[in-house]
């Protein structure tokens, strides 16, 4: 395969142009947060995002609901048109089930922005997993991803072009359900030769764990026979000053 599936169909790699490999277009993170009980914090949580609360948001991104949901389609189209006007060609949209993936909206955004948009398959951190993920086996989850990559997503003919960002949280390096998803994603990569990305646990860094947890993910990839030339680790900027770690990876 010398190209990639986009929300509007297959394109040759020569048509990609400048590409963002990790972006979110229509994102709903309600499954990951809870409204605070403290009255003052609740006021900030429910407020429209504005300059009066920006310092609070900088200290805690999830303190304001308006800050973590990207559901204003007109704004998304406007910003992607700006990206295209400055030379952008393609965006990999890593929205997933459980965090708002909406194939029809992404398709409309692609039409209106005239960008190539690659859509994803997989699941994010455990807290966001749809209930069925808990009950399905590794092979069953792999088959869902393979179907979305080869045949189409949710009964459409729109095919995923990337696996991920399959994400990890806690306990470090992964919740058991997240490991199941990653193992299934590895099997889907081997079966389809698709690109694959993992969101590493960022909790570990905050709690003082070494950033080398990502090496655990690479060990799993090797065990499952993943083509590492098709893999990229998301959020590597979190450890950008640890040169030795990046060299090892």
Spell out what each predicted region is:
Residues 27-71, 121-139:
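Active-site gating loops and adjacent loop-to-helix segments of metal-dependent hydrolytic enzymes
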Residues 70-75, 95-105, 134-147:
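Glycine-rich anion/phosphate-binding loops
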Residues 3-26:
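N-terminal basic/disordered segments at the start of proteins
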Residues 49-77, 94-99, 167-176, 201:
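Divalent metal-binding segments
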Residues 191-249:
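Active-site core of metal-dependent hydrolases
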Residues 24-26, 96-97, 122-126, 165-168, ...:
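Active-site beta-loop-alpha junctions enriched in small/polar residues
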Residues 90, 108-111, 116-195, 238-240, ...:
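Active-site gating/metal-coordination segments in enzymes
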Residues 78-92:
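Catalytic domains of carbohydrate-active enzymes, especially glycoside hydrolases
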């Amino acid at each position: 395969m010398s190209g990639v599936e986009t929300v509007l169909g297959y394109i040759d790699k020569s048509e990609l142009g400048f590409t963002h490999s990790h972006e979110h277009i229509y994102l709903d993170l309600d499954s990951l947060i809870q409204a605070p009980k403290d009255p003052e914090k609740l006021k900030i949580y429910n407020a429209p995002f504005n300059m009066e609360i920006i310092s609070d948001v900088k200290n805690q991104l999830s303190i304001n609901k308006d800050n973590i949901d990207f559901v204003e389609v007109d704004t998304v189209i406007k910003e992607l048109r700006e990206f295209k006007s400055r030379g952008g060609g393609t965006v990999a949209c890593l929205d997933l089930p459980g965090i708002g993936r909406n194939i029809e909206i992404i398709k409309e955004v692609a039409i209106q922005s005239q960008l190539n948009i690659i859509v994803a398959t997989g699941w994010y951190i455990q807290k966001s997993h749809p209930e069925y993920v808990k009950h399905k086996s590794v092979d069953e989850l792999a088959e869902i991803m393979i179907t979305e990559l080869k045949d189409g997503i949710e009964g459409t003919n729109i095919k995923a072009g990337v696996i991920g960002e399959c994400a990890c949280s806690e306990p470090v390096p992964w919740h058991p359900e997240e490991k199941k998803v990653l193992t299934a994603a590895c099997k889907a990569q081997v079966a389809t030769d698709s690109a694959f990305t993992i969101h590493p646990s960022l909790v570990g860094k905050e709690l003082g764990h070494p950033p080398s947890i990502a090496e655990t993910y690479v060990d799993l990839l090797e065990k499952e026979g993943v083509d590492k030339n098709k893999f990229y680790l998301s959020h590597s900027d979190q450890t950008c000053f640890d040169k030795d770690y990046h060299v090892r990876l």
